């Protein structure tokens, strides 16, 4: 059972507002009269009223109840709400924990009486005051949820998107467009193969040719052909010409394999010729095609000669309904046909609409949609207010300065046109205009002329130009379906402005007009970190930031620099999808310092999540999305990803979002050459051998070396990251202070030191060649003379604590770890605390998503205040308890001790006790339970230590 018609979101929001007012009144009445609010007495009315908000008839509520067996007991019970393939709902009495309702719903789904074909993707639970909605994992109902949201009844009208599945939006709209787009891309692949064979394999994405001249001539010509054919296929099904299927009939009835190429070229010429300039003797079919104008058919192409297979591929494409495609999805796929891997990939490489909306939604779209919904849903809104808001939509400029095939621009335009259509319909209803307008062109004010894109690579830019026209026509049809016939768009007189060029070299102020409203800039510039940027790109960054030292700044920060320059005298906002490294390490003060100093704040942010690359063969990138404005309102929005491949979870923001994407003080942590805290010992690199492996003793060499009694005197345990983490044994020859006579007497020492000398002497580095004079010494030595703390360079993000160990001075630390003198255990205790790993996660750098330790950035800045003797002793004792707990299982490595799914209870208890002492020392007045609480203390302490 579904609703008879899809309700628009404004109506749903209005219905939900009335629903919450009515049910909040019920709850107040129950509480005032001390009446019990039990599920059995009120749940069916509650579900019925909720479903009614989405156009589902409450009289049919009995259809949604269902008997089912529970997996835990084997007994049969009654599901409160069940819509096969859509949702299962459970209600509990007022005040009851919703976990009980959620678990009961899952129990029914796992009971075996509900067939797989009817398993719903959603669970909804309520105790009348609170609701919980869960989108289940598609692979297994009992597995981790895709997303899970809990909110109060008072907030229900703010959660239209999470409840939209009840109105069938999810299945009836986007999925159909997505599947159509995938099928359309396969047809284009078939055409490309037919025209070029399957051996063509060219770079796509950031590495694609930037100009047609750089492209293989045949591939370039095919690319232009396919762009034009796409326009014609779309025109057939979307009503661009008066005669339906005009192009398909032309190909099928008036061409042969031999004549198709020249006839297509003739058609292209005609489409670019005004009606009055055409020959009067044109054949009838060709004469029916309208004048297109624009740049689509402007250039003359060399004829393409088709064969039977090529013509059949085109006819197959003609049989498809091209009006159904999501142009933003299709455009992303279309640009990839030149890649052999992408052609075989069955369409998995594209940026989803969901990911695009994560950027443009909180930047501007959600705000405009909310304003429109409130105006439309209120019967008291006069036509004048609706028209004023619609006029305002036409005052904004929208730009993607790294637009690719235009998917961000296409999605933004499509969604904004839907907002405008709702406003037009509402205005007409209030004026009493119930009939269809004879011409709606005068009613539409939002224009593709407000949309701008910059793109370095020529073919995506060409696709974007064409795709913007196609999505404009789709939007016109939606408007026409609501109020009248679509406006005439041929010949093309208004186009989106897609500029083919290097965005970082363009003067944006010359390309983008001054907007009467705001300029919104957004997109996902190239994912190039400091390690993958070229020297030319590094020079671009130096010029843009006006700094010789750009350190580790990612290439994407060039777009931030351009925005700061552009917005110096203009109003607007901007947001980019970027690699997550811009919010880590020393990039944070370098990037966010100038942004904040220019008066910007973070309007919204998505913390680290996996963004699938559009380019085939490229792994998912760990990204963040950060949006900026210069306003005071609204309150900033922040989303976290407990699972980087999962759904976002909203994080409440009380103050502001800082450069580390944390709700807290706007502090920027700078590298320090020595510890800020008087309690910390300097952490330094371990010892680097530079020996060609000849001073190291592997497990299979140990017995041989130890058999030499002289060499055996100098064998020491050797610890790098792997040995530290996994308890592996490795040794080295440590000959610092060795007796020269011993070296002369030992064949093993002589042989190995001779090999070291030869290795160093052959080095290209002068510093290494000089070390050949002292082959018995490690090339770089920093070994402490006391017990010390050993810290790995990288720790898994899954670890609950930073995995460190104390060693005695006779254990040699390799250059793959850091070490800090720790004679009394204080350094170990501080580094083992939740406070330290919180600091590391917050301000430290990362390797992909793993934590990367840096002495100058995370250790030297760790803001431990000066401790009194008693506090210091308590922390040291608590740290020793952690070591004692580890010692209960001496066979376990650090990796095994700190497996987040299998930490020993004794070890967890010891860490909890340590945390209480360290938290208290950092200034906590009560027990801390969240990362956020620790972050607030850490930033406050850092500000004190730096007088910030």
Go through each PLM region and give its residues.
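Flexible, glycine/threonine-enriched loop-and-boundary segments that flank and lead into catalytic domains
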Residues: 379-397, 444, 490-520, 610-611, ...
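Signature of N6-adenine DNA methyltransferases within the class I
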Residues: 70-77, 94, 98, 102-104, ...
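Polybasic, glycine- and aromatic-enriched phosphate-binding surface used to engage nucleic acids
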Residues: 93, 110, 557, 633-634, ...
């Amino acid at each position: 059972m579904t609703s008879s018609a899809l309700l628009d979101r404004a109506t749903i929001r209005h219905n939900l507002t009335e629903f919450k007012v009515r049910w909040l009144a019920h709850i107040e009445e129950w509480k005032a009269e001390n009446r019990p609010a039990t599920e059995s007495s009120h749940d069916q009315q509650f579900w019925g009223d909720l479903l009614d908000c989405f156009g589902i008839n409450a009289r049919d509520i009995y259809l949604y109840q269902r008997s089912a067996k529970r997996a835990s007991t084997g007994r049969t019970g009654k599901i409160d709400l069940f819509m096969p393939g859509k949702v299962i709902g459970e209600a509990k009495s007022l005040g009851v924990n919703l976990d009980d309702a959620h678990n009961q719903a899952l129990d029914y789904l796992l009971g075996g009486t509900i067939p797989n074909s009817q398993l719903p993707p959603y669970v909804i639970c309520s105790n009348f005051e609170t609701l919980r909605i869960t989108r289940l994992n598609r692979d297994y109902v009992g597995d981790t949820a895709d997303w899970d949201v809990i909110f109060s009844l008072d907030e229900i009208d703010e959660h239209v998107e999470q409840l939209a599945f009840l109105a069938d939006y999810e299945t009836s709209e986007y999925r159909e467009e997505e599947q159509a787009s995938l099928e359309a891309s396969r047809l284009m692949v078939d055409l490309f193969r037919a025209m070029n064979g399957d051996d063509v394999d060219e770079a796509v994405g950031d590495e694609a040719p930037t100009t047609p001249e750089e492209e293989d001539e045949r591939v370039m010509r095919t690319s232009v052909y396919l762009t034009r054919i796409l326009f014609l296929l779309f025109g057939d099904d979307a009503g661009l010409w008066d005669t339906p299927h005009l192009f398909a009939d032309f190909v099928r009835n008036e061409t042969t394999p031999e004549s198709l190429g020249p006839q297509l070229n003739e058609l292209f010429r005609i489409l670019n010729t005004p009606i009055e300039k055409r020959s009067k003797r044109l054949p009838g079919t060709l004469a029916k095609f309208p004048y297109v104008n624009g740049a689509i058919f402007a250039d003359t192409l060399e004829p393409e000669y088709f064969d039977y297979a090529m013509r059949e591929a085109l006819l197959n494409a003609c049989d498809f309904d091209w009006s159904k495609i999501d142009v933003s999805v299709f455009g992303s796929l279309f640009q990839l046909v030149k890649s052999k891997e992408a052609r075989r990939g069955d369409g998995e490489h594209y940026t989803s609409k969901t990911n695009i909306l994560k950027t443009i939604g909180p930047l501007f779209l959600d705000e405009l949609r909310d304003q429109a919904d409130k105006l439309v849903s209120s019967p008291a809104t006069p036509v004048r207010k609706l028209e004023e808001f619609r006029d305002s939509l036409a005052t904004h400029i929208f730009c993607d300065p790294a637009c690719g095939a235009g998917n961000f621009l296409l999605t933004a335009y499509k969604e904004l046109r839907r907002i405008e259509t709702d406003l037009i319909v509402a205005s007409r209803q209030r004026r009493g205009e119930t009939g269809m307008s004879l011409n709606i062109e005068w009613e539409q004010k939002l224009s593709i002329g407000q949309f701008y894109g910059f793109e370095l690579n020529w073919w995506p830019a060409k696709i974007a130009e064409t795709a913007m026209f196609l999505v404009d026509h789709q939007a016109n049809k939606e408007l026409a379906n609501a109020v009248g016939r679509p406006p005439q768009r041929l010949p093309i007189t208004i186009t989106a402005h897609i500029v083919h060029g290097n965005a970082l070299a363009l003067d944006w102020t010359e390309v983008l007009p001054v907007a009467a409203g705001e300029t919104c800039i957004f997109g996902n510039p190239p994912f190039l970190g400091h390690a993958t940027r070229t020297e030319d790109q590094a020079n671009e960054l130096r010029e843009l930031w006006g700094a010789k030292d750009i350190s580790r700044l990612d290439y994407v920060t060039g777009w931030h620099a351009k925005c700061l320059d552009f917005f110096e005298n203009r109003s607007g906002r901007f947001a980019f999808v970027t690699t997550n490294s811009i919010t880590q390490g020393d990039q944070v003060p370098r990037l966010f310092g100038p942004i904040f100093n220019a008066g910007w704040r973070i309007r919204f942010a998505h913390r680290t999540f996996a963004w699938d690359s559009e380019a085939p063969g490229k792994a998912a990138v760990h990204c963040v999305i950060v949006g900026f404005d210069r306003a005071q309102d609204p309150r900033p929005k922040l989303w976290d990803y407990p699972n980087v491949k999962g759904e976002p979870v909203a994080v409440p923001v009380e103050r502001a979002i800082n450069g580390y994407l944390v709700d807290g003080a706007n502090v920027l942590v700078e590298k320090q050459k020595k510890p800020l805290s008087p309690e910390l010992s300097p952490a330094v690199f371990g010892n680097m051998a530079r020996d060609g492996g000849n001073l190291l003793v592997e497990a299979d060499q140990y017995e041989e070396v130890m058999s030499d009694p002289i060499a055996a005197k100098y064998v020491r345990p050797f610890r790098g990251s792997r040995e530290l983490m996994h308890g592996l044994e490795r040794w080295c020859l440590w000959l610092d202070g060795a007796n020269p006579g011993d070296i002369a007497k030992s064949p093993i020492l002589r042989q190995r030191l001779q090999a070291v000398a030869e290795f160093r002497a052959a080095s290209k580095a002068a510093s290494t060649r000089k070390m050949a004079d002292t082959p018995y010494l490690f090339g770089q030595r920093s070994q402490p003379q006391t017990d010390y703390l050993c810290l790995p360079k990288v720790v898994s993000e899954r670890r609950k604590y930073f995995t460190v160990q104390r060693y005695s001075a006779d254990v040699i630390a390799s250059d793959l770890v850091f070490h800090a003198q720790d004679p009394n255990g204080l350094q170990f205790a501080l580094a083992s605390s939740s406070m330290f790993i919180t600091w590391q996660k917050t301000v430290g750098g990362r390797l992909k998503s793993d934590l990367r330790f840096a002495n100058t950035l995370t250790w030297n800045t760790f803001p431990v205040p000066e401790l009194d003797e008693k506090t210091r002793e308590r922390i040291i004792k608590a740290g020793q308890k952690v070591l004692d707990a580890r010692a209960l299982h001496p066979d376990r490595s650090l990796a095994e001790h700190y497996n987040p799914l299998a930490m020993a209870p004794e070890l967890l208890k010891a860490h909890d006790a340590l945390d209480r002492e360290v938290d208290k020392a950092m200034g906590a007045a009560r027990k801390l339970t969240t990362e956020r609480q620790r972050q607030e203390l850490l930033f406050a302490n850092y500000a004190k230590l730096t007088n910030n």
